[in-house]
Amino acid sequence: MAKQGRIFAVIFLALLIPVLLKAPESEAKVYRGKCKSNLAWSYDSKTKTMVIDCKGDMPDDKQFYGLDMGWKEYYLQTKKVVFKEGIKSIGAGAFEKFQNLESIVLPRKLCIIKNWAFSGCIKLNKIKEFRSIRTIGVNAFSNTALRKFSLKNIRRMKNNCLSSSKLVEISIPANCKIGSFVFWDCKKLKKATIERGVKNISDGMFCATALKNITIPGSVTKIGEDAFSYCQNLKK
């Protein structure tokens, strides 16, 4: 009987040890930090959500202006970024190469997204609230998974700002100043509409896209070099 008891105890321990050694299910942890005097951030490890609370302009990444952003420690984990109201501009390189970032929620009064802000966010496919944006910086959304992007109120699009993205269709507003190679290498871009009032189609603007249809208004007086190069499917 004692022998059977010992055998039972051994079996019980054998079953219990893996449970004891197993790492506990990760509890929700919220990491917080500050950057300069006007910005606070938090990261929720359970929801994989980053929240940015900033009054005024966000600072730029150290790659650009020598400032270290603590939230970049979570660049591989973050899937969503929420910007609270009060932010006027998103800093240069602020979320560059957040490779698992899928969606962002922008504040209603955001005006500027600076250079390289979301460049290399290869899974980014959803943006909420971007009607107030006026300027998109150089490479701001290059190499992302964005299929849709409203340019309705945009006044300035800098070089390569949406290059190598997954855009399917685009409409360019009348009063927008457009940099070079803005849609370069958007291999899924099949249709583009340029509103009356646009005067220039910039260098390499639609280079290497899948463009099949484009509407060019009579207001256009200049088409830049290589604007439609490698658009092998372009019909009209």
What are these regions (language model features)?
Residues T49-D57, L76-S89, Q99-I112, I122-T135, ...:
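Structural signature of tandem-repeat unit edges
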Residues V10-V19:
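Bacterial N-terminal signal peptides
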Residues M1-I11:
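Bacterial N-terminal signal peptides that target proteins for export
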Residues L20-Y31:
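Sec-dependent signal peptide cleavage junction
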Residues K29-N100, A117-S119, W184, M205-F206:
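Surface-exposed repetitive/solenoidal architectures
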Residues Y31-G33, K109, S119, N159, ...:
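Secreted/extracellular small peptides and ectodomain modules produced from precursors
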Residues G91-A94, K114-A117, G137-A140, K158-C161, ...:
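Consensus positions within tandem repeat domains that build extended binding/scaffold surfaces
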Residues A40-W41, G93-A94, I127, N160, ...:
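Short, T/G/N/S-enriched strand-turn elements that build extracellular solenoid repeat scaffolds
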